[in-house]
Design a protein with these regions (language model features):
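Conserved, structured core segments of small domains
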Residues: 1-103
């Protein structure tokens, strides 16, 4: 699953000159892959796109930055939304797991 992570730190906790942006995460955690990293450095914000197999692995990945920044984690996808069923009955049946009877 893909996640957009926004890490925000205060200027006094800035990693510039102290390991840099990569010091705020652990890229060696199994089950996690850093897809992309961007910074709005003068705002002290780092944006990550991370693929993680589970939330525990994602938390371990972000652990190095836990005491110096906050992290907003949002699940994201590159898949389009499914087409919405046109019939309310089809929606209700799908929600309840009922077969519509058509093959």
């Amino acid at each position: 699953m893909l996640f957009h992570v926004e890490q925000v730190h205060k200027p006094e906790h800035c990693p510039y000159g102290h390991g840099g942006s990569t010091s705020l995460h652990d890229a060696t955690v199994a089950g996690v892959r850093l897809v992309a990293m961007y910074g709005s450095f003068m705002e002290h914000v780092i944006y990550l796109i991370v693929e993680a197999s589970d939330v525990n692995s994602l938390n371990l990945f972000l652990l190095p930055g836990m005491k110096t920044c906050t992290a907003k984690i949002t699940p994201v996808s590159d898949h389009p939304l499914p087409i919405q069923p046109s019939s309310p009955v089809a929606v209700e049946g799908a929600r309840l797991g009922i077969d519509s009877g058509s093959d």
